[in-house]
Amino acid sequence: MSMDVTFLGTGAAYPSPTRGASALVLRCEGECWLFDCGEGTQTQLMKSQLKAGRITKIFITHLHGDHFFGLPGLLCTISLQSGSMVTKQPIEIYGPVGLRDFIWRTMELSHTELVFPYVVHELVPTADQCPTEELQESVQVDKTDNPPKEGEGRTILLDSEENSYLLVDDEQFVVKAFRLFHRIPSFGFSVVEKKRPGKLNAQKLKDLGVPPGPAYGKLKNGISVVLENGVTISPQDVLKKPIVGRKICILGDCSGVVDDAGVKLCFEADLLIHEATLDDTQMDKAKEHGHSTPQMAATFAKLCQAKRLVLTHFSQRYKPVALAREGEADGIVELKKQAESVLDLQEVTLAEDFMVISIPIKK
């Protein structure tokens, strides 16, 4: 099962000609999950190999404009491109409290009626995620009625035992959110692929006298079969070790995690995506504004024993290497060196718009 991440926007604060506002897509077998949706994300999607109509889930890390102002426009474009008869499953949208009302207000004020259903699930933040004066209580707007295509979403509270939020638990994935510290409540997401049955052991099947055909499929799917001689063959008799799932972790803007839940959820991540807005010489400024530097990101990655660190959300002063004029590339390359020095020279990737990173199946 193929899995990859496409970066649509790797810049901080606002979109520019060289770096779009924050957005990336996790793609698995054709299904696309969008993480953040800064202004201009739909245009970036059009320039990529991805199809907006394949998006089934959207995750918003926090409610700063450069991470979600592109959402209403994207939803409208998906609607316009979908035609009048749509029977698709609802698009599931996850984000902090306030996101549901934002979408509702933009749809109401623009007299927009989406042709597809959607559901907004809101994460309730805690007081230790940002400065006290910035934490706002959820305010329910006085709605005359719900948009016709909006389903009833969940209000997701922090699990006090695990210090995380359970967002998705289906046949393939478990997705949990964890708290980050920023100027406003921000979240990170851990996407874990569930273990899959191991491959069939052809030699054992032959030795046990299992004939090729439907019995193979049943055993592969965890169902025992009875042979003509009355012998029962269990899946564990003929299956190799289960294939361990992959783990991708995506952090929103932050100057740190609130507790150790983030470390636990990101432990041994195959891919850890972390912001690095400013270089290490500006660490005090970064922390003041709730952001990270390469050293801070790499320290977290090292604590998690992440297998690969990707830095993103760069200040627009840091041009991509390929697009920087002579001498300008030094700044972005220095960020890479700063992170690698913490990770004992383990290679660190600098995200660029339209970069695609594959996450191979574990052997």
UniProtKB/Swiss-Prot annotation:
Pfam families referenced in this protein's UniProt entry, alphabetically: Lactamase_B, Lactamase_B_2
Gene3D superfamilies: Ribonuclease Z/Hydroxyacylglutathione hydrolase-like
Cofactor-binding details, from the entry: Binds 2 Zn(2+) ions.
EC number: 3.1.26.11
SUPFAM superfamilies, per the entry: Metallo-hydrolase/oxidoreductase (SSF56281)
Binding site for Zn(2+) 2: 66-67, 253, 313
Enzyme's top EC category: hydrolase
Cellular compartment(s): Cytoplasm, Cytosol; Nucleus
Binding-site residues, Zn(2+) 1: 62, 64, 182, 253
Names of required cofactors: Zn(2+)
Positions of the catalytic residues: 66
Swiss-Prot/TrEMBL catalytic activity: Endonucleolytic cleavage of RNA, removing extra 3' nucleotides from tRNA precursor, generating 3' termini of tRNAs. A 3'-hydroxy group is left at the tRNA terminus and a 5'-phosphoryl group is left at the trailer molecule
CC annotations in GO: cytosol; nucleoplasm; nucleus
GO molecular function annotation: 3'-tRNA processing endoribonuclease activity; metal ion binding; tRNA-specific ribonuclease activity
Keywords annotated in UniProt: Cytoplasm, Endonuclease, Hydrolase, Metal-binding, Nuclease, Nucleus, tRNA processing, Zinc
One GO term of the biological process aspect: rescue of stalled ribosome
Family: Belongs to the RNase Z family.
Role: Zinc phosphodiesterase, which displays some tRNA 3'-processing endonuclease activity. Specifically involved in tRNA repair: acts downstream of the ribosome-associated quality control (RQC) pathway by removing a 2',3'-cyclic phosphate from tRNAs following cleavage by ANKZF1. tRNAs are then processed by TRNT1.
Complexes and interactors: Homodimer.
Protein name: Zinc phosphodiesterase ELAC protein 1
UniProt gene name: ELAC1
